Design a protein with these regions (language model features):
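Bacterial N-terminal signal peptides that target proteins for export
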Residues: 1-7
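Carbohydrate-interacting regions of secretory-pathway proteins
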Residues: 20-199
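Bacterial N-terminal signal peptides
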Residues: 7-16
Length: 199
């Protein structure tokens, strides 16, 4: 009986140790420079006071990290000049288009936008709103936390800790994380970007 209990205890310890490894958060952004990221398009990217900043028009910055089943989280803020619209997105399981027809990543986008019908919390695929958010919880010039989880075909978004979107889709299997600069006159800022694999 004692031997069985010892073996059971060892099995539990090994199980929890494995889960601990699977749940380790990994930083996507070092807060100092663009190391670990690749720029595509016209948008200009820089680091200011520990914040990743994108301005100047359409373009995307891709993280080197590749994700399949994962959780990701980060703090985001968008703003725009008078007369312009603020629009951005946090992409996942995405890759640059091979033919660069429109420059948009091929993958999933967690929308960041406060002034259109498909606002922050919506799921987009290239040019198409796909999963609808339950409510708008973000504003221009205010930081908010995005938390994304995708395992297999199941996608979930949380904003500031509140679940706002669930959807199932199987088109894109694996790819990078990316952030979008959408149009002139707007600015996207991001910090505290992390992800972890889910096994």
């Amino acid at each position: 009986m004692k031997i069985k209990f010892t073996l059971l205890l060892m099995a539990c310890l090994l199980l929890f140790a494995g889960q601990g490894e699977a749940k380790k958060w990994v930083s996507l952004f070092n807060g100092k420079d663009l190391n670990g990221w690749t720029v595509h398009g016209k948008a200009k990217w820089s680091v200011e006071n520990g914040v990743l900043v994108g301005v100047g028009g359409m373009g995307h910055i891709y993280a080197d990290a590749v994700c399949t089943d994962f959780e990701a989280k980060g703090m985001f803020r968008i703003s725009s000049d008078p007369g312009s619209k603020s629009n951005s997105g946090f992409y996942f399981r995405c890759n640059p288009p091979a033919d660069n027809i429109d420059g948009f990543p091929r993958g999933y986008e967690a929308q960041i936008c406060h002034n259109q019908d498909a606002y922050s919390g919506w799921l987009w695929k290239p040019g198409t709103p796909t999963g609808k958010a339950t409510e708008l919880l973000t504003k221009d010039n205010e930081w908010f936390e995005y938390h994304i989880k995708m395992v297999g075909e199941h996608i979930q978004f949380w904003i500031n800790g509140k679940l706002v979107m669930t959807y199932d889709d199987k088109e894109y299997k694996t790819g990078h994380f990316a952030i979008q600069g959408h149009n002139p006159g707007m600015k996207i800022e991001a910090k505290e970007l992390y992800y972890r694999e889910v096994k």
